[in-house]
């Protein structure tokens, strides 16, 4: 029997394996895909958020701020591509300025270091390509960009070298509680373990409902991006956000660690693992991003 089975080897499963590999445990990772970091971890905004957005006092607030600091340490230790470029949340009209103050107060309560509310002039001095409609911005210097696929892979490699077993193409199709732990059904047999870490991403609710009542549901959200040529990579030097809304942090414009420019995403609820791109979605991303940085050459 294993001590711990980790279901899923995206960035969360990889980080769990990396941390647990320091201890004398028998750990196995069960990854449904044929490689690690093959789902959400390989296709996202690649940003380590500063932590001003979560509500103060929540677990998310505490872990966000602690996590961005830990990620910096891990990337340095494992030689993972990382750049602490900081982020700017823009107010594109006077009505959005109070929201910057709200985020600043959130971040202060959460312990986000070095934040500052910038004037219009200070904002444009930092990013001359921004829209002339900018009224101010929230500056968060601890935000960073990373290669998330490389990050997850590096942590997994260390975990495996330290004795963690990695099983790829090993989808968990059922689970049951047994005396002293759980029995997981996988291709070709079963795995017995004392503990389970559910890091199954958008399928985590289905894994949960194998052994517990289905008391929550994950609704996957598809995001569409433009990844632009390196000729656009210096268009901005920081992660550029608009004021967040109910669907999330909105369409961003950001450099990548490889020198490209990343623009997006939108947020469309979908069924299952729908990763298609649509002309309407990309047009929305383009139009929305140009509110922040009108000169982007799409």
Which role does the model predict for each range below?
Residues 2-29:
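N-terminal Rossmann-like FAD-binding beta1-loop-alpha1 element of flavoenzymes
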Residues 12, 35, 203:
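Conserved Rossmann-like nucleotide-cofactor binding loop
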Residues 18-22, 48, 78-83, 181, ...:
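Active-site substrate-recognition segment that forms the wall
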Residues 21-43:
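Glycine-rich FAD pyrophosphate-binding loop
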Residues 31, 84, 119-120, 168-170, ...:
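Short loop/edge segments at beta-strand edges and connector loops
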Residues 46-126, 135, 250-251:
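Dinucleotide-binding Rossmann-like beta1-alpha1 core, especially the glycine-rich loop
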Residues 55, 62-65, 90-99, 138-157, ...:
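Short beta-strand to alpha-helix junction loop
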Residues 138-195:
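Helical element adjacent to the flavin cofactor pocket in flavoenzyme catalytic cores
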